[in-house]
A protein has these predicted regions:
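Glycine-rich phosphate-binding loop of actin/hexokinase-like ATP-binding domains
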Residues: 65-70, 74-90, 133, 137-172, ...
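Acidic-glycine-rich active-site phosphate/pyrophosphate-binding loop
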Residues: 10-14, 88-89, 192-206, 250-262
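N-terminal glycine/serine-rich phosphate-binding loop of ATP-dependent small-molecule kinases
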Residues: 1-77, 88, 104, 132, ...
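Gly/Ser/Thr-rich active-site cleft segment
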Residues: 102-220
Length: 280
């Protein structure tokens, strides 16, 4: 979607990236090609002047991540959150650190849907990942990397790994160590809205855009929906519909009660500094 600086929608493009029936994984290169396609179509047709494009931001689903090597090449497909790989790995994490401790750090009930147990599965079962993984990136992280050359993630995306310390806004050394993952294999976490770099020159030429276009960290999709709907204060909520229906209420503090997380409610940073949200 292309917006003016005042938030007026100027153009819209949509692209599917179908997978085989019953598959629990997705090709990250295919997703990036679709992203390029919708960017190109958003700035074609005369509704948007290419020279006026100032920034590109990306929002995506969470959990699923792709391992890349030093050159940014994908080492395997992304394992989606619906895939059952990672069940035994999640149990091992709980046995090592305890469910209560993990929840106290991540503000989430540990589950195999998150990135960390799936990263463990990939590292233990795919030799290319075990030998060459340089970064583990979620979908938005991967697209932003391909656009800018920078390895980053947003706080809201990082929370979907079950390896992020919500209170300290950093990767948890204890969780990564328990999973056998090095800290440097994770992208740098930044606040939503951070300018992470400029559009790569070769992509600028391909898309007909300026290489001064800023690449801006977006957010996990439900937080983006809340922000776009104007849910910017504690006590407000949005009901978003799409592939799933999700109610996103906003709080002015971190909620860490055992009853909250045991019922599978999370607590994640909002796009507005000092606010937090959950998904229901």
């Amino acid at each position: 979607v292309a917006f003016s600086e005042n938030g007026v929608q100027l153009s819209l493009a949509y692209s599917e990236y179908p997978t085989s029936a019953g598959a629990g994984d997705m090709n990250a290169d295919t997703i990036f090609d679709a992203a390029k396609d919708v960017i190109a179509r958003c700035v074609s047709g005369g509704k948007v002047e290419r020279s006026d494009v100032a920034a590109i931001s990306v929002t995506s689903f969470g959990e699923a991540c792709v391992p890349v090597d030093r050159e940014g090449n994908c080492l395997c497909d992304m394992i989606m959150y619906t895939d059952r790989r990672g069940v035994s790995e999640n149990e091992r994490l709980i046995e090592k650190l305890g469910r209560k401790y993990i929840s106290s750090v991540t503000c989430a009930n540990p589950a195999p849907m998150y990135s960390l147990p799936k990263i463990m599965w990939m590292s233990e079962n795919i030799s290319a990942v075990r030998e060459s993984a340089f970064r583990f990136l979620q979908a938005a992280d991967f697209i932003c990397y391909r656009l800018s050359g920078e390895f980053t993630t947003t706080y809201t995306q990082a929370c979907r790994t079950d390896a992020f310390d919500v209170e300290r806004l950093r990767w948890s050394p204890e969780l990564l160590e328990a999973a056998g993952i090095r800290m440097e294999q994770m992208p740098d976490p930044v606040p939503n809205g951070t300018v992470i770099g400029l559009l790569r020159r070769e992509l600028a030429a391909e898309l007909g855009l300026s290489d001064t276009v800023k690449i801006v960290a977006g957010s996990q999709d439900q937080i983006a929906a809340a922000t776009g709907a104007g849910v910017l204060s504690a006590g407000q909520a949005v009901d978003g519909t799409g592939s799933v229906e999700c109610i996103t209420p906003v709080f002015d503090r971190i909620i860490k009660s055992e009853g909250f997380t045991s019922n599978n409610y999370v607590c994640v940073p909002h796009s507005v500094v000092g606010l937090y949200a959950t998904y229901a």
